A protein has these predicted regions:
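A residue-level marker of the well-folded mature domains of exported/periplasmic proteins
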Residues: 42-53, 57-382
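Secretory targeting signatures
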Residues: 1-69
Length: 382
């Protein structure tokens, strides 16, 4: 009996040993956990691993793109010296950014430089963050600094208002002032009582000649008998005393309408018209709030230009280069036109006295003629 038990136990032990050995060889990877290499060839494994790594990289790229797309979009605005409250380019540029914020959801940061020397630093500060889909620089005197900074940050989009630089990442926004000036000339030609109208320019350069050419053509289109006096030029942008002297001389010569495109020098010309009680026309922005003798201003719709550039940047269609906007693009006009009234009333908190109906109708006719191509406005750049 004892021998039988011993034999049985020995048999069981042998079976266990044999079973364990068989299990080890049949399931060699149960401990540790099996890997992909245990079931496929080395070449297949390497291929699968490469495909897996590529998929992970694509996923990471997609996640980064989603984060970029969902990140709030912002614009940087570098105002001209003088800051907000200038009732000029700064205020209307700010209005364009505010319109983009309200309509497109694009927020904006802005700075108010105190001196031209600060432009380059502010441009670089904005560009180096990489946070802005567009950086907008207001006024011609930012051009020199921008040509430097734009070259340093070729992937950053910039827009420059009222001047041209040649960097490929800068949209240079200019305005066909001759077209808006044509409408001013129509008004002067229709409303003159003496039959003579005058013009005071800042400098005798093509830019300012462009204003005069449109003004003269508009006056003669509306009134073939009108005499448009030869233009006079201050020779400076910030000499209102000289501007006033030149305008006073024109008035003494019988001109009862003064159109001024002379920067701060032009304020003196408008003051002379006010003191002498003759019609006056402002420029760039609606300056009609200055004096009751103001009967219109040639307007550069910087707000529209700024808004369009922000929209292009937002949807990925921004392109650097030269942009010229006129009446067709709604970049220039005259502030007595009904479509412009709400903007100027909001900015300047005053309401115009309406133009006489026959004058307004003639201005609208001229505007429509320019739009249709029936009227070709001469330019000072010829």
């Amino acid at each position: 009996m004892a021998q039988t038990s011993t034999t049985l136990i020995a048999g069981i032990m042998i079976a266990l040993v044999i079973g364990a050995a068989i299990g080890w060889f049949v399931y060699p990877a149960m401990n540790p956990t099996p890997s992909l290499e245990d079931y496929v060839s080395k070449a297949s494994y390497n291929q699968l691993k490469a495909e897996s790594d590529a998929a992970k990289a694509q996923l990471a790229t997609a996640q980064a793109e989603i984060e970029e797309l969902t990140k709030p979009k912002k614009v940087g605005l570098i105002l001209a010296t003088g800051g907000l409250g200038d009732k000029s380019f700064n205020d209307i540029s700010f209005a364009g950014c505010q319109m983009a914020k309200d309509k497109l959801g694009v927020d904006f940061d802005y700075v108010e430089p105190n001196a031209i020397a600060e432009y380059e630093g502010f441009q670089r500060d904005f560009a180096m963050t990489g946070d802005y889909i567009l950086i907008i620089c207001i006024a011609f005197d930012q051009a020199e600094a921008l040509s430097i900074v734009a070259a340093e940050y070729p992937e950053q989009n910039f827009a420059l208002v009222d001047m041209v630089v040649n960097n490929t990442n800068v949209a240079s926004l200019t305005f066909r002032a001759n077209e808006g000036s044509f409408l001013v000339g129509v008004t002067a030609g229709m409303m003159t009582e003496t039959g003579k109208v005058g013009f005071v320019g800042g400098m005798d350069i093509p830019l300012i000649r462009d204003f005069f050419e449109g003004y003269e053509a508009g006056a003669k289109w509306a009134n073939p008998n009108v005499v448009v006096s030869a233009p006079v030029f201050v020779g400076a942008w910030a000499d209102p005393t000289k501007g006033k002297e030149l305008a006073t001389t024109l008035i003494e010569q019988g001109n009862d309408a003064i159109y001024s495109a002379a920067g701060k020098s032009g304020l003196g010309a408008l003051e002379a018209a006010h003191e002498e009680g003759v019609m006056a026309f402002g420029v760039d922005l609606c300056q009609d709030y200055l004096y009751p003798e103001m009967v219109g201003s040639m307007t550069k719709r910087v707000d529209e230009a700024v808004y369009e550039m922000i929209l292009d940047a937002l949807v990925g269609k921004f392109k650097g280069g030269f942009y010229s906007g006129g009446i067709k693009e709604k970049w220039v006009g005259m502030c007595r036109l009904p479509e412009e009234e709400p903007l100027w009333e909001e900015l300047f908190k005053f309401k115009h006295q309406p133009l006489p109906a026959d004058v307004l109708n003639k201005v609208k006719e001229a505007r429509d003629g320019i739009l249709s191509g029936e009227i070709t406005v001469p330019t000072g750049y010829d």
